[in-house]
Amino acid sequence: MWKLQPTESGGESVILLAGQEYVVGRKNCEILLTNDQSISRVHAVLTVTEQAVTLKDSSKYGTFVNGEKLESGSTKTLQTGYKITFGVFQSKFSLEKECIVVCSSCVDNEGKVTLSQDIRSVGGRLVSSWTSDCTHLVMPTVKVTIKTICALLCCRPIVKPAFFSALSKAVQQKLPLPKAERFRPQIDEPSLARDDVDLSARPERKSLFKGKTFLFLSSKQMKRLSVAVSCGGGVSQLLDEGALPVSLLESSSTCVLDMISGNSQPVISPASKKWLDSVGQILHRKGLRFITESEVGLAAIHVSNQTYCNPCSSLQSESVKTNPVFASATLSQSTAVDETALAAPSQNITAYVVNTEISQDQSRMVTSGISAVGETPEKTNPTQKASTTNKPLSLGQEPSSTRIVQETVMSSESFSVVESEQKMKKGSVVSARGRVEGPVKQKAPSSGNTTLKHSPQKQTALTSFFQPSSKKRPRESSASSVQPEPKFFKKDIKDNEDDIQQSFSVNRSHKTSSEETSLGQACGTGQNSSSKKRKEPEQDTLLGAEEPTAADDLEMSLEELEFLMSDEMDEPPQTAANKKQRLESGLTSKINSEQLSNQQEVTESKGRKGEKNQQSSSSNIQSMQLDRAGPAVTNQDTQTQSKRSPPDLEAHSSANKGPSKNKTPELEEVKKEEVSFVVNSRPQNGISQTSEAVLKQEMQASTSNSGPKNDPDLPRKLLQVQFMSLTVNNSSRSRPGPLQTHNPNDKNVKRFRKKNVPGFDGLPKIIGGSDLVAHNRSKHSELEEWLRQAAEEEKLNEREETLGDDLFRYNPRPAKKR
């Protein structure tokens, strides 16, 4: 855009657009000079292009270019700065070329289209990035961006998009040009006060950074801010990674830009982190600091470099404070997290553990190449530990407390050295098959040296950590042979402990302390561990109540139990209700054992029939019983075993391979009679039927006394889950025959069958609606509640914004004319 600027004050400038011709004259022309009598009606013609302006003289008194008179009818090409005089009086102008280069910021696409049309109408152009050639910055509202900082430092006006619409209209209608101050946008920065910000052109901003060197640590940061630094008179310099120019860094005129302040999630290598720390140490040693990117904009807005972009000053504003540099490794490697169990209401499972505090003495055990990991102590306060020892545990105790217990896996193989010494001291019967047959009641040695050698962590059993919970799923008798080993130990030990307490609750009811159960560690050096088989927990104690005549074994078991009852107890005492229940069950089992012994004498002749088939099974079960618990069990497990079906007994007995080393003739005979009584009894005479009726009564009495309703250790409130396939199969319908029988000799008149209309036989079963409702809707209740609250908050915010927009929207309705 070219412009004829009058040399005398008070005159109006004339805009010359490219591609048009302008006639200078006194009447009926584009450029009127009415106050000069030496101006002809058609004095001269100006032809405007992008590069130059051509002048053709057609006047009477002449036209002068830089003081030289043009000949009449001649043509002269004019350049920027030429002085032109029309006539002989005071119609003097200077030719100037004004390039309108507009940069836009925060303008939407529709606004850019309109803005570009207005700028092209006055001979300008629209650019997307700021350069030194830009003359205007267009923003709807002022936000502190790199373009805003550059426009302030270059003293360029910041205007609204409406400014160029008014400029285009003024040029076309030859009206006075609009002023940029009237189209200045408002500030839209919450951290800046409108009264403190001056967006007008102030020349001191051009030299705001003069004499300062801005040292950049990354090339991206330098590319983004170097234009703003150069607009303020500063010098930009990139510091190579690893370089430490001490003299440059220690200078007070050097502004070291913080590399992390501009990035929300910087990715810094360890070498770069070490280099940044070295640069920071050099700065702190001289009392200097890093400069953040925001300080460049604040210095340009406030026209001051005393506080901002001054490494010697300290900032109190939170918005420009330097952020500490963290290594990326701390996100995943230097964070200590305690693995804790969730609260009971969220898991819907309540698990408790007993006090298993580790001894202060150092423990040592000989593993002979086999490693085992013990349990860690429970993290509780001393007061909580004392209360746990003195109070009985219940299923509802402390549902919200958090316990930290590290679960470990115990090897199925045993420690040979420990087992051999314990076998000699305790006198207990241990199986030589190379597997743990069951828990053996033992007393911890009183000697301190022996404890250090053979009792790591006081031989804590797995039952301390795998207590039966009321939320466990019931197991079928056929599936117990393949259950995991730790769970098998837990259930087996619990049953054995209950049986011992029931047997001796009458004679030793004054005892209030509970027993400490430890996992029997079997020695299996001569056998292969791959031949280990799991038995049912009820079969392990099958022969306990059928030996009333074995006086020697009974005395040995009584001495062993007295030895156990006097030991220290770490397990919490049982409740009074459980003791009373076990007392009653013990008396009942004693009576049942006497009745069952009388019945076995009557049916002894029938038991001889299946002697050969059950011989191997009874010997294996007898050996297993002698190895696990001895004769110190009640008749309750015997009645439970008698309720099993013949396939179960045969399946479990066949799993035990190899003969037993310890055999007693009397026990073997009794066991044969019992197995034949259960398996091979047939209604041959009245005596057998009577014994079966008595056995049914005994089974009912045993079930009523030790049923799942009265036994607190059995699981309750179980949930049965069934997986159904939601498919619909079309039922095959038989094709109805014709109404009339077909005779091949008759004439074929009408032989067709009408087809029923769909829906005639009833609507099909449609799976939908309530059939597809999820079973457990409370599983994601917290997530659904959070989503619902978020949706309500969003609707509330939208409603408030709508009310605010309606409040400030001004749409007056025109009044109706009457």
Swiss-Prot record:
Q: Which UniProt keywords apply?
A: Cell cycle, Chromosome, DNA damage, DNA repair, Meiosis, Nucleus, Telomere
- What one GO molecular function would you report for this record? phosphorylation-dependent protein binding
Every copy of the BRCT domain together lies at 91-168, 211-301
Q: The motif FxF/Y motif: which residues?
A: 804-813
Q: Which SUPFAM superfamilies match?
A: BRCT domain (SSF52113), SMAD/FHA domain (SSF49879)
| Gene Ontology, cellular component aspect | chromosome, telomeric region; Mre11 complex; PML body; site of double-strand break
**Pfam families for the chain:** BRCT (PF00533), FHA (PF00498), Nbs1_C (PF08599), NIBRIN_BRCT_II (PF16508)
Instruction: Provide the domain comment.
Output: The FHA and BRCT domains specifically recognize and bind phosphorylated proteins. The C-terminal domain contains a MRE11-binding site, and this interaction is required for the nuclear localization of the MRN complex.
Q: What is this protein called?
A: Nibrin
This protein's encoding gene: nbn
Biased composition regions of type Basic and acidic residues, renumbered to the chain: 603-612, 663-675, 793-808
**Could you tell me which species this protein originates from?**
Danio rerio (Zebrafish)
Q: What is the lineage of its organism?
A: Eukaryota, Metazoa, Chordata, Craniata, Vertebrata
Q: Which InterPro entries match?
A: BRCT_dom, BRCT_dom_sf, FHA_dom, Nibrin-rel, Nibrin_BRCT2, Nibrin_BRCT2_sf, Nibrin_C, Nibrin_met
As for what it does, the entry says: Component of the MRN complex, which plays a central role in double-strand break (DSB) repair, DNA recombination, maintenance of telomere integrity and meiosis. The MRN complex is involved in the repair of DNA double-strand breaks (DSBs) via homologous recombination (HR), an error-free mechanism which primarily occurs during S and G2 phases. The complex (1) mediates the end resection of damaged DNA, which generates proper single-stranded DNA, a key initial steps in HR, and is (2) required for the recruitment of other repair factors and efficient activation of ATM and ATR upon DNA damage.
